[in-house]
Amino acid sequence: MEFRDWMEDALYDKERGYYTTRLDSIPDYVTAPNFGPYLGQTIARELGRAWHLLPTHAQPQVFSLVEVGCGSQASLTRSILETLQANEPGLYCNLQAILVDRSVPRLSQALDKLSRAFPNKVFGCPDMAQI
């Protein structure tokens, strides 16, 4: 068995995979977005700056923000959306957030949480190739 296949099974096997069987709220590790909203706020500020550099006629009707590997919390997307909603209403209006996570249960949890907070803004799919 190649390492790639072993890792695929270890992480995503439907019955034994780490990301498909562990849905508890106590993670084994934390990433930068889980420490607080600071990374998301910084990214949102930079997105706002980039948005304002575009001439109005060049600003896209739909601006897609994609978080790959969002997990069950989608903390990064949440803090970006909160910041844009408060500080960049023009960009927020045109924005759609797409959450990607291969674990469908985790993706469903994230979509449920963010869809309630940001109606009609958050979408999801388990496969990056589907975007």
Which sequence ranges carry the predicted segments?
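Rossmann-like AdoMet
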Residues: 1-130
